[in-house]
């Protein structure tokens, strides 16, 4: 028997405490469940201000349920890399192509849904940090993603705990693990 549809307002009312930093997400449909056909569906809340970029070998589908978010992306096929910010407003959807470095920045009282298709067997995810002074990659970690909810958090914490990993080899700038107050501004469409 199939489960009932998920009512997002009711789920948030009962479970918003599960959206905790540093990732602020909860997998409502886990890929290990036979009913999901390997898909991952997450509810993600704000605020978060992590500076890491994630590379997934499959596309990611974003639906912004409440408020606006900013999806920071990088085109690494050119040198120097080109950084592009994509606002995703309440009620909007966005399909991020596979293998695109991205950093989803969510603001206070915002909620989104992210869906990832099944990863190919032994697909390698990458998390990386760019130097905000020179644009070079400061550090990256590759891993086979078996549990997005825990593995991303572990990599973020590993980077945060090691100043050597956070130091840019090109210019010596120490990378921050969070954006500073006012450094990233919520897209203006739904500001109060």
Curated annotation (Swiss-Prot):
One of its GO terms (cellular component) is cytoplasm. It is found in: Cytoplasm. A divalent metal cation binds at residues 131, 134, 168, 171. O2 binds at residue 50. It catalyses: 3-hydroxyanthranilate + O2 = (2Z,4Z)-2-amino-3-carboxymuconate 6-semialdehyde. Its EC number is 1.13.11.6. Pathway: Cofactor biosynthesis; NAD(+) biosynthesis; quinolinate from L-kynurenine: step 3/3. Catalyzes the oxidative ring opening of 3-hydroxyanthranilate to 2-amino-3-carboxymuconate semialdehyde, which spontaneously cyclizes to quinolinate. This is 3-hydroxyanthranilate 3,4-dioxygenase 1. It comes from Aspergillus fumigatus (strain ATCC MYA-4609 / CBS 101355 / FGSC A1100 / Af293) (Neosartorya fumigata). The gene is bna1-1.
